[in-house]
């Protein structure tokens, strides 16, 4: 399970260190792709296989299903950690997520997310205001 928030930098070659807390669970190779809210999603290879199976159930007769699958899968790339714990994020994904030098990597249960730091901070500030209301609307259990 992935959790936590970590600030890292993207170098001029598009490489970024993956937080050490995430490296063990991700293994040496994992998948990154376009996420929602202008971030990148990162999945273990095992989790990616499960997502692929779920996506196969989407009705291809639905235009939105086709659009979503095209965007999600065409952006997917297998990345490999180098000896310094970095991955190379392809230019098309850096552009999609508007990644600048300053990035934030967060853990979200079964995936990691890679955000431009300013975009993350804006999203966080906006979401923090409605956090309790969202919990009340979505969650039916105590914790």
Swiss-Prot record:
Record flagged with keyword Hydrolase: no
Coiled coil: none
SpoVT-AbrB domain span: 5-47, 76-119
Keywords: Cytoplasm, DNA-binding, Repeat, Transcription, Transcription regulation
HAMAP family, A to Z: MraZ
Oligomer status and interactors: Forms oligomers.
Entry protein name: Transcriptional regulator MraZ
